């Protein structure tokens, strides 16, 4: 059965053990799916996934989805109405100004930020779990990690894939709330806590503007960009 692809939505999820791609119609009926199996690995005491496997897995899941569309509906998959990305929250992906990865991806599974989480929780008066991105960043400061000399962006796995597809450095407010506390009144990062973090960073010898490192925060329905030619080639 032929389907109206312009009214369809493509969802991609990068979970702990599978990367999944699902196509649904305007009535939210699943039409086709594809997947890629992967697993995190322990390298030098850190739970991580290689970034090249992110690309390979997304391509494989999309290819399987396209094959399923052809098998079930007898048509190619040249376009869709919209794309949504979901992935493991939290963790730490640090990049330089040209979006080169500075250190291996630190996933939410890592419990290596106890000192940072405790200090930030006390300073903010707000619970900061070890898995949160800001805890990983501050722990890197406490550890005097060399990659901080070049850091220009931090994001999550979903944020990174969104950037690869659209060129837009942004997160939905839900994902963003796993990086840094959100002010419920503004729907943006908490300004007072951002200031406190910058003050703590300065005491550690780092002149950071944390807000400049973080992705933009978008609420549901906001314009999050469009698939670029580079993003389409990735798929």
At which residue positions do the language-model features occur?
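N-terminal phosphate-binding loop and adjacent alpha-helix
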Residues: 34-75, 119-125
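Short glycine-rich, Thr/Ser-proximal phosphate-binding strand/loop in the N-terminal lobe
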Residues: 9, 14-52, 100-107
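Glycine-rich phosphate-binding/catalytic subdomain of phosphoryl-transfer
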Residues: 63-235
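N-terminal start-of-chain detector that recognizes signal peptides
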Residues: 9, 54-56, 133, 153
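ATP-binding/phosphotransfer module of carbohydrate and carboxylate kinases, centering on a glycine-rich
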Residues: 2-3, 22, 232-233
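Residues within well-formed alpha-helices
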Residues: 20, 57-60, 230
């Amino acid at each position: 059965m032929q389907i109206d692809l312009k009214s369809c939505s493509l969802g991609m999820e990068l979970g702990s053990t599978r990367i999944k791609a699902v196509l649904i119609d305007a009535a939210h009926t699943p039409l086709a799916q594809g997947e890629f199996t992967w697993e995190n690995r322990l390298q030098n005491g850190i739970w991580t996934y290689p970034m090249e496997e992110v690309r390979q897995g997304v391509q494989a899941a999309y290819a399987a989805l396209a094959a399923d569309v052809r098998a079930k509906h007898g048509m190619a998959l040249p376009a869709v109405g919209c794309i949504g990305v979901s992935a493991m929250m939290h963790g730490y992906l640090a990049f330089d100004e040209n979006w080169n990865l500075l250190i291996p991806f630190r996933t939410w599974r890592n419990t290596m930020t106890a000192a940072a989480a405790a200090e930030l929780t006390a300073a903010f008066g707000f619970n900061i779990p070890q898995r949160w991105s800001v805890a990983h960043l501050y722990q890197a400061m406490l550890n005097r990690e060399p990659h901080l000399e070049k850091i220009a962006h931090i994001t999550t796995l979903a944020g990174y894939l969104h950037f690869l597809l659209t060129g837009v450095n942004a997160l939905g407010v839900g994902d963003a709330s796993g990086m840094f506390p959100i002010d419920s009144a503004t729907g943006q990062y908490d300004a007072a806590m951002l200031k406190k973090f910058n003050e703590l960073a300065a005491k550690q010898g780092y002149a950071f503007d944390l807000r400049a490192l973080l992705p933009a925060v978008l609420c549901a329905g906001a314009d999050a960009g469009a698939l670029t030619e580079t993003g389409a080639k990735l798929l």
